[in-house]
């Protein structure tokens, strides 16, 4: 066991060092190049690493205008036509420009950042190159309804936490405490523009994912090892990978009930598939299964676009006074309430 732990630690040190060498101190991210969405090449053959595995390395972004769930008005329509996609893209980018102009007019004294440099320029985003109407695949295009037992479980949890949100730092969300940000949770889905970059670094027997946000690092062994014992539970679960042709398949189990994904339980089972479909395109697909939360598994497919980078430094906890200020404010509010009641 000690030799195994030493091997894991050594591999982690190498891949993290490689990732850190290409990072630059700053804040923000790069956007994918504007213009026509890349076609996913069916016959494209990815380059190989020194040990002969498909080379997934690079800096990727999942920024997209495609919604996670399909709008109800589209019904079972799974794909847009070229004409529909072009029209939607034009209107979406125009809307973003108008919104930015309205914000500037409302507060001309506000500090305005260079949105393109800092990765907030949504006018350069595009819909998924797959032309899907939603990132969730299938005729429904939405997350399946939650089972009654799952609704009851989540309601009980919410009721237990109600009124205790500000008791202690342990009652605050993990993101406020800089422990686990939304963009680094798995499965990985598009969120706010900022912090969405992901760098992939490979070594013999390992694939490492380095998130821009919070610099979290996920090391995935691909050497055929089994999952850790069920008694070991982790916020991000236990991930093991293997190769199926040109696709990296990652199986993750052993979640806790503290980091529920969309109301899931510790029974969550996640299968991710990473396929490099073109020089600048990665298809990230994941299937979610939790028999205590949903009646059936469901799948989403998210095209990633390669970007030049660099991955800027993203600082969270340095100079962070959020938690102390929130708790201090809560104590003041409690004192004021007690004074009103004459206590």
Language model feature labels by segment:
Residues 2-343:
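PEST-like low-complexity, intrinsically disordered acidic/proline/serine-rich tracts
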């Amino acid at each position: 066991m000690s030799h195994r732990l030493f091997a894991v630690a050594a591999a982690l040190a190498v891949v993290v060092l490689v990732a850190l060498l290409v990072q630059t101190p700053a804040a923000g991210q790069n956007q994918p190049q504007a213009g026509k969405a890349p076609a996913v090449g069916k016959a494209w053959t990815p380059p190989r690493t020194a040990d002969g595995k498909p080379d997934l390395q690079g800096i990727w972004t999942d920024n997209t205008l495609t919604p996670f769930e399909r709008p109800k008005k589209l019904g079972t329509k799974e794909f847009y036509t070229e004409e529909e996609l072009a029209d939607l893209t034009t209107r979406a980018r125009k809307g973003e420009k108008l919104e930015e102009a309205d914000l500037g007019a409302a507060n001309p004294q506000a500090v305005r950042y260079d949105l393109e440099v800092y990765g907030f320029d949504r006018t350069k985003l595009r819909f998924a190159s797959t032309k899907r109407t939603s990132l969730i695949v299938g005729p429904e295009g939405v997350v399946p309804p939650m089972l009654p037992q799952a609704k009851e479980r989540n309601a009980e949890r919410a009721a237990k936490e109600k009124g205790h949100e500000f008791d202690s730092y342990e009652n605050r969300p993990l993101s406020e405490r800089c422990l686990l940000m939304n963009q680094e949770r798995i499965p990985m889905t598009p969120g706010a523009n900022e912090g969405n970059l992901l760098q992939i670094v490979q070594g013999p027997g390992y694939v490492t994912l380095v998130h821009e946000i919070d610099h979290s690092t996920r090391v995935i062994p691909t050497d055929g090892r089994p999952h850790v014992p069920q008694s070991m539970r982790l916020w991000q679960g236990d991930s093991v990978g293997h190769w199926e042709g040109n696709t990296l398949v990652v199986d993750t189990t052993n979640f806790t009930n503290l980091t529920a994904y969309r109301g899931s339980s510790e029974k969550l089972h996640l299968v991710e598939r990473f396929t490099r479909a073109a020089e600048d395109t990665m298809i990230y697909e994941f299937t979610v299964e939790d028999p205590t939360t949903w009646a059936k598994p469901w799948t989403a497919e998210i095209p990633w676009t390669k970007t030049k980078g660099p991955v800027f430094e993203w600082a969270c906890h340095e100079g962070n006074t959020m938690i102390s200020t929130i708790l201090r404010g809560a104590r003041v509010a409690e004192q004021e309430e007690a004074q009103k009641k004459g206590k």
